[in-house]
C-alpha cells in the first residue's frame, strides 16, 4: 500500500477493500467504477463492484451521505443492485448525455457477403485520420488513412448488432439514517442535496439529466426561447397562481424561474479536452493510450458514421486512462451531494478526475486506485489542481 498526501487529499495505491475498512465519517462517495464490460480487454473492468465493496463504502460514510456512481447502459442493473443490497437507499438515476460515442456494431451485411464470397461495391472513400490500426484502409497523402465505404447486395445490408452509445446512467443512493432529514443535517451535515449551488442557467432547478452540449444532443430537445427569471411574484388573495398562500402571498421578494428553453434547461458540460486530461502531467512520458477499438470495416460502411473516430486507437497521450470524465461534470456532481467542507471518497479513482474536481471545489478527498500507472497520473493531476486552488486563495 502506498499513501500520498496532497493538501487536503489523501491518495492510496491499493485495493479499495484494504483501505475502506479504516475510513470513517466521510460525507459523500462520487465514483466511476468498472462497468463490467471488459472494456478494451481490461481485467479491472471484468465485473461491477460487489456487495462486499459497497458495504465497506456504506460503513465509511456518515448517516445520510450520498453515493453517486457511474455505470454502463448495459450493466446499470448489475451495478445498482449490489449498492441497494449493501444497505443504500436508491434515490434517483441521473443521466449524462453525450454525442461522441461510437457504435460497436457488427456489420451483418458485410459478414454475410464474406461468407458467400460476394464482392462489395466501393461507393465512397473517407479520410479517417491518423493512427488507424485495422480494417479496410490504405495510406493517403501525409500518412493519413483513407477507408473504402462499401455496399453489398445482401438482404441484410444495413443491419447491425448494436446502437450508438449516447448516455451513461449514474446511481444516486443515500445511506439510511434515523429521524428527520433536518435533524440528521444538523447532526452530521449530510442527507440533503445542494439545490441552489447546482441551479442551471441562472436559476433552474437541477434535473437528473446532464449533457455535453454537442449538436447531436441539442437536436433532441425542442427549440423554444431561452427562459430566465419570470419576475416579481406578487399575490393578493388566498392561493395564488403560483401556489403561494399565507404570509408569503404579498411578498414581492420571491422570484420564479421559467422552465422554457431547450437543452439549456439542463447542466451542460463539454466532453473531456486534452488540456483537462493532461493538466499537470508535464513530467510524465507520452505512452500509447487505450480506447477506441473495433475494426474500421465494421463501422464505416455507413457514411454518416465516418467521423474518423470509429474503430480507431487513440493517439499516444500522457493520460492513458480510457474513461476520463470531464472535470466540470465531476465538480457539479461533487457539489451536488457534498456539504461545505466535506470529504469525498472515490474507491475507484482511476486518473483522478473526482479528486481533481473535489480539490477545485474546496472539498477534502480520499482516493483509492490499485493501478500504479493510473495512481501516478492521478497524483500529478490532483497536485496541479491543488496548486491552482492555492493560487485562487491568494
What are these regions (language model features)?
Residues 2-394:
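Core catalytic lobe of class I
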Amino acid at each position: 500500500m502506498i499513501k500520498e498526501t496532497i493538501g487536503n487529499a489523501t491518495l492510496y495505491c491499493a485495493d479499495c477493500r484494504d483501505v475502506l475498512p479504516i475510513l470513517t465519517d466521510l460525507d459523500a462517495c462520487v465514483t466511476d467504477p468498472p462497468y463490467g464490460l471488459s472494456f478494451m480487454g481490461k481485467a479491472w473492468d471484468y465485473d461491477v463492484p460487489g456487495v462486499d465493496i459497497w458495504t465497506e463504502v456504506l460503513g465509511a460514510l456518515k448517516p445520510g451521505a450520498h453515493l453517486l456512481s457511474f455505470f454502463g447502459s448495459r450493466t446499470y442493473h448489475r451495478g445498482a443492485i449490489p449498492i441497494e443490497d449493501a444497505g443504500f437507499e436508491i434515490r434517483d438515476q441521473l443521466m449524462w448525455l453525450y454525442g461522441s460515442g461510437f457504435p460497436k456494431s457488427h456489420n451483418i451485411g458485410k459478414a454475410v457477403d464474406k461468407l458467400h464470397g460476394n464482392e462489395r461495391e466501393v461507393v465512397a472513400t473517407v479520410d479517417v485520420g491518423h493512427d488507424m490500426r485495422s480494417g479496410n484502409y490504405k495510406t493517403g497523402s501525409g500518412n493519413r488513412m483513407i477507408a473504402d465505404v462499401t455496399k453489398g447486395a445482401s438482404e441484410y445490408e444495413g443491419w447491425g448488432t448494436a446502437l450508438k452509445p449516447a448516455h451513461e446512467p449514474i446511481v444516486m443512493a443515500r445511506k439510511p439514517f434515523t429521524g428527520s432529514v433536518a435533524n440528521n443535517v444538523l447532526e452530521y451535515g449530510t442527507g440533503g442535496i445542494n439545490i441552489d449551488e447546482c441551479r442551471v442557467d441562472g436559476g433552474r432547478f437541477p434535473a437528473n439529466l446532464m449533457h455535453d452540449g454537442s449538436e447531436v444532443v441539442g437536436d433532441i430537445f425542442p427549440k423554444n426561447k431561452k427562459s430566465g427569471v419570470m419576475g416579481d411574484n406578487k399575490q393578493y388573495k388566498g392561493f395564488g397562481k403560483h401556489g403561494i398562500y399565507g404570509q408569503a402571498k404579498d411578498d414581492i421578494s420571491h422570484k420564479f424561474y421559467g422552465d422554457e428553453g431547450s437543452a439549456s434547461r439542463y447542466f451542460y458540460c463539454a466532453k473531456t479536452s486534452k488540456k483537462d486530461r493532461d493538466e499537470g502531467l508535464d513530467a510524465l512520458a507520452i505512452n500509447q493510450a487505450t480506447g477506441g477499438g473495433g475494426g474500421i470495416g465494421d463501422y464505416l460502411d455507413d457514411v454518416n458514421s465516418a467521423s474518423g473516430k470509429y474503430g480507431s486507437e487513440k493517439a499516444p497521450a500522457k493520460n492513458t486512462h480510457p474513461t476520463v470524465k470531464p472535470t466540470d461534470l465531476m465538480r457539479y456532481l461533487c457539489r451536488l451531494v457534498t456539504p461545505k467542507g466535506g470529504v469525498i471518497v472515490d474507491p475507484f479513482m482511476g486518473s483522478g478526475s473526482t479528486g481533481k474536481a473535489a480539490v477545485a471545489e474546496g472539498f477534502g478527498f480520499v482516493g483509492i486506485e490499485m493501478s500504479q500507472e493510473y495512481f501516478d497520473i492521478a497524483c500529478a493531476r490532483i497536485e496541479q489542481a491543488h496548486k491552482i486552488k492555492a493560487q485562487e486563495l491568494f
